[in-house]
A protein has these predicted regions:
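Glycine-rich anion/phosphate-binding loops
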Residues: 17-30, 84-91
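Active-site beta-loop-alpha junctions enriched in small/polar residues
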Residues: 8, 47-49, 83-89, 109-111, ...
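Short beta-strand segments at enzyme active-site cores
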Residues: 5, 39-49, 76-84, 106, ...
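Conserved anion-binding
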Residues: 91-172
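Single conserved hydrophobic/aromatic residue that forms the stacking wall/gate
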Residues: 1-11
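Glycine-rich, proline-tolerant flexible connector loops at the mouths of alpha/beta enzymes
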Residues: 40-64, 111-116, 170-183
Length: 204
C-alpha cells in the first residue's frame, strides 16, 4: 500500500495520572518525531487505556480523544487514522468525522474473534449504516485475524480477508502478527494477497 510507514501513537484517558494538556503535549511530540522520521500516516489510539472495554467506550474517553486529535498540529499531507480500542468502530468514525481524519482502524469488523476482552463479534452492518450518514469520506482499515486474539476453530485467514472487502465494506485489509510488535507470518500475507490480488493491504 502506498503509505511508506504508519506509526501508532497512544492517548491515555486517566486524568488522575496525567492531565489532558499533558496528553496533548506528549502526543504532539510523538507527531513531530514521527513526521521527522518520514512517515506518511499516523494512527492515533487510546493504547494507554488498558484494560480495554470491549466495544463501547465512555463518553469521557470519546470527548477527550476528540479534543486531543483536534489540538494536534499535523501537516495536511500526513494521513491521520483513528483506532478506538478495543473495538469501538462507531466511536472511531465519530472522532474521525469531527476531526477530519482520513481513516479508521477497526480490529474486528466482521466475523468473531476470541480476545483478551472476551468474545468480540464484528458489527459491519451497524458501522456501514453509520458511515453512510457521515459527511466526510473516511476509509475503513480492517484487521484480519487481529493481534491478541484467535479466530473460531477452522477459520481461514484468506476467507476472512475476502469477506472483509467483499461483504464487510473494508477499504484496506491489515495483516499483523500475533501481538503488538510481533512480526507477521509471511505465509498468511501471501494467502491474503492471493485471495484479494487487487485489494489494498497494510502491514502493522
Amino acid at each position: 500500500y502506498p503509505l511508506r510507514r504508519q506509526r501508532q501513537m497512544c492517548i491515555r484517558d486517566r486524568s488522575n495520572r496525567i492531565s489532558l494538556d499533558e496528553i496533548i503535549d506528549h502526543a504532539q511530540e510523538d507527531v513531530n518525531n514521527l513526521i521527522f522520521g518520514g512517515v506518511d500516516g499516523i494512527i492515533i489510539e487510546n493504547f494507554g487505556d488498558t484494560p480495554f472495554v470491549k466495544d463501547d467506550i465512555s463518553k469521557r474517553t470519546l470527548a477527550n480523544f476528540t479534543t486531543v486529535v483536534e489540538n494536534l498540529s499535523i501537516d495536511k499531507d500526513i494521513k491521520i487514522g483513528i483506532n478506538v480500542l478495543r473495538n469501538d468502530g462507531i466511536a472511531a468514525l465519530s472522532i474521525a468525522e469531527a476531526t477530519k481524519s482520513n481513516f479508521v482502524r477497526i480490529n474486528v469488523l466482521n466475523n468473531t474473534m476470541f480476545t483478551d476482552q472476551g468474545v468480540i463479534e464484528g458489527k459491519s452492518h451497524e458501522i456501514s449504516q453509520f458511515k453512510s450518514t457521515l459527511n466526510n469520506v473516511i476509509e475503513i482499515y480492517a484487521d484480519v485475524f487481529v493481534k491478541h486474539a484467535v479466530p473460531a476453530p477452522g477459520s481461514k485467514i484468506e476467507n476472512h480477508a475476502a469477506e472483509l472487502i467483499e461483504r464487510a465494506g473494508a477499504d484496506v485489509v491489515i495483516v499483523t502478527g500475533d501481538g503488538t510488535g510481533h512480526e507477521i507470518n509471511l505465509n498468511d500475507l501471501e494467502k491474503v494477497r492471493n485471495i484479494v490480488p487487487e485489494g489494498k493491504l497494510a502491514i502493522g
